């Protein structure tokens, strides 16, 4: 009996019993390799859905925007930012209006050519009055008599470049010398404008001249300075002094005729008002002194460049 059972076991081994299909499994069957991942579910789906908020957002992110206190803080911060921006723009417009600055750069090629000819040959020009349209002065591109800041700015840059070239030709170029030349020219223009403003204020001269107007008229001298230095480099000292005399006379004539329409023309308007204390001869002194000062500045800023 035992022999038959042992022989039966040797010739016919017992087959592994398959697990029941319907009942739960206490242990995983690892004999045929790892089971697929999608068959394992150690956590309930209800628990996972409770941990993840709707919309796929991380916990706590949606609560910030849903919090009334956070929304109020954001609105208050944006209000403070807008108020600060308005205050900054108001202070900037108080000292330098952007719209007024755009007016002085509203030029075109035709205006630039006419203005340069007027600066070099002002003797044949007849009409010096600035034109208006509905109590607003026309832009420089529509009126050659209107002051601009484009020509003074470009002339100042060209003067600095020409000064660097002149110093390089004479083997005297260095960044320090060129920087000193540029700063000196800029400081002289600032001093001239400040003296002009102070004179108008002390003499109680009521005029429509703005600070930008004075900067423009003061900056036109750089055109004559460019001509003077260029002629000095080409023709030596003789060419320099001839160009200096021509550009100085032309600039003085231009300044007198232009400021005459701004300063002297307001005498009749102020004769019945508070500006009557400013006598006409004082206004004439301001105009003539501003024009007579130009040749000395031109000579001071160009003589060291031509040797």
UniProtKB/Swiss-Prot annotation:
<keyword id="KW-0472">Membrane</keyword>
<keyword id="KW-0812">Transmembrane</keyword>
<dbReference type="GO" id="GO:0005789">
    <property type="term" value="C:endoplasmic reticulum membrane"/>
</dbReference>
<feature type="transmembrane region" description="Helical">
    <location>
        <begin position="149"/>
        <end position="169"/>
    </location>
</feature>
<dbReference type="GO" id="GO:0030134">
    <property type="term" value="C:COPII-coated ER to Golgi transport vesicle"/>
</dbReference>
<protein>
    <recommendedName>
        <fullName>Protein YIF1A</fullName>
    </recommendedName>
</protein>
<feature type="topological domain" description="Lumenal">
    <location>
        <begin position="237"/>
        <end position="239"/>
    </location>
</feature>
<keyword id="KW-1133">Transmembrane helix</keyword>
<comment type="similarity">
    <text>Belongs to the YIF1 family.</text>
</comment>
<keyword id="KW-0813">Transport</keyword>
<keyword id="KW-0256">Endoplasmic reticulum</keyword>
<dbReference type="Pfam" id="PF03878">
    <property type="entry name" value="YIF1"/>
</dbReference>
<dbReference type="GO" id="GO:0006888">
    <property type="term" value="P:endoplasmic reticulum to Golgi vesicle-mediated transport"/>
</dbReference>
<feature type="topological domain" description="Cytoplasmic">
    <location>
        <begin position="1"/>
        <end position="148"/>
    </location>
</feature>
<feature type="transmembrane region" description="Helical">
    <location>
        <begin position="240"/>
        <end position="259"/>
    </location>
</feature>
<comment type="function">
    <text>Possible role in transport between endoplasmic reticulum and Golgi.</text>
</comment>
<keyword id="KW-0333">Golgi apparatus</keyword>
<feature type="transmembrane region" description="Helical">
    <location>
        <begin position="286"/>
        <end position="306"/>
    </location>
</feature>
<dbReference type="GO" id="GO:0005793">
    <property type="term" value="C:endoplasmic reticulum-Golgi intermediate compartment"/>
</dbReference>
<dbReference type="GO" id="GO:0000139">
    <property type="term" value="C:Golgi membrane"/>
</dbReference>
<dbReference type="InterPro" id="IPR005578">
    <property type="entry name" value="Yif1_fam"/>
</dbReference>
<dbReference type="GO" id="GO:0033116">
    <property type="term" value="C:endoplasmic reticulum-Golgi intermediate compartment membrane"/>
</dbReference>
<dbReference type="GO" id="GO:0015031">
    <property type="term" value="P:protein transport"/>
</dbReference>
<keyword id="KW-0653">Protein transport</keyword>
<feature type="region of interest" description="Disordered">
    <location>
        <begin position="1"/>
        <end position="42"/>
    </location>
</feature>
<feature type="topological domain" description="Lumenal">
    <location>
        <begin position="170"/>
        <end position="184"/>
    </location>
</feature>
<keyword id="KW-0931">ER-Golgi transport</keyword>
<feature type="topological domain" description="Cytoplasmic">
    <location>
        <begin position="260"/>
        <end position="285"/>
    </location>
</feature>
<feature type="transmembrane region" description="Helical">
    <location>
        <begin position="185"/>
        <end position="205"/>
    </location>
</feature>
<feature type="transmembrane region" description="Helical">
    <location>
        <begin position="214"/>
        <end position="236"/>
    </location>
</feature>
<feature type="topological domain" description="Cytoplasmic">
    <location>
        <begin position="206"/>
        <end position="213"/>
    </location>
</feature>
